[in-house]
Each structure stands twice: as C-alpha cells, then as structure tokens.
A protein has these predicted regions:
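A conserved regulatory-domain signal marking ACT and ACT-like small-molecule sensing domains
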Residues: 2-173
C-alpha cells in the first residue's frame, strides 16, 4: 500500500549520549534553532551521570545534510556522541499513543529475575513497554512501566502472581 506525500512526514531521530553536564540540551537546541523544524518528541534520562537524550524532529528533507553536519560539530564541541536517523514516517505513526497503562512495581530488593518475568508476561499479553522509569530507590525501589496494547485486567491477572513470588507489589492503572 502506498501513501501520498500528504500522509508522510520527513523526520530526524537524534540520539545524544555522553557524560552529563549543564548546557548540553541548550547547545543541542541552539544548533537546531536556525532550521525550520518542529520538535515531535523528546525523552531524556540520566543514570549515574550518563546522559541519553533523544529528540525526534520533523524537517524539510533538503536540510538533512546541513543539520547532520551541524550536529557532528556540536558533538565534538560537547564531547558527546550524536547519532541520527533520517526517514519518512507516516504522520499517523507520529501521534501520541492513547490508552496507555501504567504499572508500578515496588520492592525492597528488585532483581533482574523479577523484571525478566514481568517483561516476558507483558510481552506475552501483547503489550509493548513504551517507557521505564525509576520513581524511588529508598527504602523501596519503585519502577514504572508505561505500556500500550493490553488491558488493565489482563495485566493485573498475569503480573500479580509474579510480583508475589518475587516479594514485590504491583499496581496497574
């Protein structure tokens, strides 16, 4: 099935990683500001002073090489790594997902085994993990999974026994 140009948007996915320090986001957006682009999505996480920043932009395809060159210079000046992926996307794929489910997992000691079992159960129920965030670490570790593609009831039924067997608690919202 082909799509018309009206159904597609040219995008650039920017993935920046490196040691976190003040001013990285400001510098990145300063480099992008001369171009006629729109920020479609953005996520940032810092774990143990390591930064991962992803930005999805909508742009004119004619600007791709100039943006890529400016981002390479930015990476050198900031001493970070920047990878890019430019492609056409269906506009419908860029819209915000609805009906997301939030699963909170809390435990005094959260193990890889527990997360492996929960992630497998989530997948087996047809859900996709959209985002994972640590909300707290002391005295309990609390992790939030944001999921798409399943029902609250199904997830509650499948995750509850796993949580109990791993001395954890879950809340599905």
């Amino acid at each position: 099935m082909s799509t018309s140009a009206d159904d597609e948007q040219y995008t650039g996915l920017i993935l920046l990683s490196g040691v976190d320090k003040p001013g990285i986001a400001a510098s990145l957006f300063e480099v992008l500001s001369p171009f006629s682009i729109t920020i479609v999505d953005i996520e940032q996480v810092v774990v143990k002073d390591r930064l991962i920043l992803t930005v999805l932009i909508a742009l004119n395809p004619a600007h791709e090489s100039a943006i890529a060159a400016d981002l390479e210079s930015c990476a050198v000046s900031l001493d970070v790594d920047i990878a890019t992926l430019f492609s056409y996307e269906e506009k419908s794929a860029l819209s915000t997902k609805s009906n997301l489910i939030h699963v909170l997992i809390s435990a005094k000691k959260l193990t890889p085994k527990a997360l492996s079992q929960m992630a497998a159960s989530i997948s087996q129920n047809g859900a996709n993990i959209e985002r994972v965030t640590r909300l707290a670490s002391n005295p309990l570790t609390i992790i939030e999974f944001v999921l798409s593609g399943a029902t609250k009831e199904t997830l509650t039924q499948s995750l509850s026994p796993i949580a109990i067997s791993n001395s954890a608690e879950i809340t599905v919202q």
